[in-house]
Amino acid sequence: MNRLSKMAVNRIATVGPRFLPFAEAASEDLPLSRLLRLSMFQVSVGMAMVLLVGTLNRVMIVELEVPASIVGIMISLPLLFAPFRALIGFKSDTHKSALGWRRVPYIWKGTLLQWGGFAIMPFALIVLSGQESAAGAPEWIGILSAAVSFLLVGAGVHTVQTVGLALATDLAPREDQPNVVGLMYVMLLVGMIVSALLFGMWLEDFYHAKLIKVIQGAAVATMVFNVIALWKMEARDRVRARQRLEGDPEPSFREAWGLFTRGPNARRLLWVIGLGTLGFGLSDVLLEPFGGQVLDMSVAATTKLTAAVAGGTLVGFAWASRVLSRGYDPMAMAGWGAVVGLPAFAIITFSATLQSEPVFVFGTMMAGFGAGLFSHGTLTATMRSAPKAQVGLALGAWGAVQATSAGAGIALGGVFRDAVRIRRSAISSARRPYSLSTRSNWRCWSRPSSSATG
């Protein structure tokens, strides 16, 4: 029996990595168990994204009856901090600490910001809606408090994710860094899928008290996940601290950014990232209200749409990793992702004519698949275009442009929806903005081709 057990263990050790995406990211210095524990911060980020873009988007528009334009602007507020992601990553690279820590202080501050935003958010949203006990409250109090809560969560999410990815890159051997970053984003999508399913189950029967429990529970979970991720992860290096205090001054952010943007096709690459992300982002604020108002889907059913998007993105990310590891052009991969988005949004629009939830869900998953191909392609291209000493800055630049464009798309999607609703019926107002996403993706298709050849 002992012999059979040894044979089974050896067999699993040999075959297992074939079925574990990014298993090659682990090393002797960074085993898979430690790497997965570090990736817990991505789970908290994915949970926040589901709440902001998915669950609260639907709840604010349908249940709380907040105008879609206000909802779009509120959801886009966290992305005001997106342009600072490159600066945050640069500051954590050059941070001077008596303990020699560079990443931990920034991740902890980001965690506190995220926790504080979630703590006050449910009460701010109820005041914003003006329902029940908040019926007599001044409107500006609800708008201001909701805006502050969204801003706090946004600042925390961007800080935690940017510096967390930099910490993961620090801990991994250089040859494994791309796979480690890929694993981090896979864990982000896993966190989104699990969170979307749980939120959908908990909000099956919606009422204000349950909304408060869910959002404040997310605040507690954020603190727990990030503390687990940080615990004994970054070593205290007093020698490095002394060297930074006594050594030559670090280059300024302007100098470092100038060096990065002078790289081959760097500016063109950032434009491609922005246009493609804008195309996919235009639909984010519309998916769940579309399902609720056009197809009469429940809160739980529309919340699970976020899991469908994340699932499609996860498949796209895994497929892109497999193809790119064989030497395929990353910008060509990004171009194919934009092309996949064209029929995806057409299918979503056509589902209203058929009044078919399965068609709608299929189109949503297809859009997520295209977004996964596009994101992985642009991320890989960004990392390959960066100098060896600026991989962290390159990751920050990629995240800054992508998040800023996503926020612009979310805000424009809500504004377009309300503008079309003035002249059209409720069904057509929910359908027409998807054509805007299709047009933006079509413009982006020409960009990656020129970037790849330029």
Curated annotation (Swiss-Prot):
Organism: Rhodovulum sulfidophilum
Membrane topology note: Multi-pass membrane protein
Name of the featured protein: Protein PucC
Subcellular location: Cell membrane
Entry keyword set: Antenna complex, Cell membrane, Membrane, Transmembrane, Transmembrane helix
SUPFAM superfamilies attached to this UniProt entry: MFS general substrate transporter
The keyword Transmembrane is annotated on this UniProt entry: yes
GO CC field: light-harvesting complex; plasma membrane
Gene: pucC
Family of this protein: Belongs to the PucC family.
Function comment: PucC is required for high-level transcription of the puc operon.
Organism superkingdom: Bacteria
Transmembrane segments: 35-55, 70-90, 110-130, 140-160, 180-200, 211-231, 270-290, 299-319, 330-350, 359-379, 391-411
Pfam families with a match to the protein in the record: PUCC
CDD domains: MFS_BCD_PucC-like
Chain coiled-coil ranges: none
